[in-house]
Amino acid sequence: MEKSVRGWESVDFFEVDNVERPDEPIAPGAHCLVYGPKESGKTTLLFQHALSVANRDPSARVMFVCKRDAIEARPPLLQRASTLGDGAGRIQMKYLNNDAELRRLGSVIHLLPPETLPTLIVIDGMTSFFAPAQGGDNREREMRLARTLASLHECADSCGRMRSEHVVEGEQCLLLASCPA
């Protein structure tokens, strides 16, 4: 098996000439949260990264998790379909509605055959899956969010271990989530 350690490449996020690239890449194996104002381009950034990863590595499998109504109302800004590359076919869209479905996905994803496990899990609009707390007390909602993030972190690590054992030695699965400010 060929050793492959996939990390975050600045080129994945910054393919525009007038955007300054960071000096240091994000450490391999590190998971990442993209945080910013509502409608600031987080979905476009996430999808561009997913596409870049899938185009760069033919063995990459990307799972892009989002709410269908949100992605249809404000789709990511993309290049023309003819220039998306072969990687677009390796991005699996998964539409979920709430935090229970998100936790369920994280608890069963390891049942997939190792070669179909994702190498990148993208969660667009993480907090949108969690209903607002009734009565104004958000502690319970925040605890569910924290537990779900921890579960998804473990899910990504497990997918990476399984792919490393059965597909490509040293391969990882990274978790990338967005959250509006």
Task: Annotate each language-model stretch with its function.
Residues E2-P75:
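Glycine-rich P-loop/Walker A and Walker A-like loops and their local beta1-loop-alpha1 context
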Residues P25-I26, N55-D57, T83-D86, L111-T116, ...:
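Conserved catalytic network of the ASCE P-loop NTPase/AAA+ motor domain
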Residues P28-C32, H49, P58-R61, G87-Q92, ...:
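Core residues of folded domains in eukaryotic genome-function proteins
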Residues A30-Y35, L120, A133-G136, S151, ...:
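Large eukaryotic, non-enzymatic subunits of multiprotein complexes that serve as scaffolds/tethers
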Residues L33, F64-V65, I121-D124, L174-P180:
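Extended hydrophobic secondary-structure segments that form protein cores and membrane-embedded regions
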Residues T44-Q48, G89, A100-R103, S107, ...:
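Amphipathic alpha-helical interface elements that mediate macromolecular binding in regulatory proteins
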Residues M63-G135:
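Conserved inter-motif catalytic segment of the P-loop NTP-binding fold
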Residues E140-P180:
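Substrate-engagement module of ASCE P-loop NTPases
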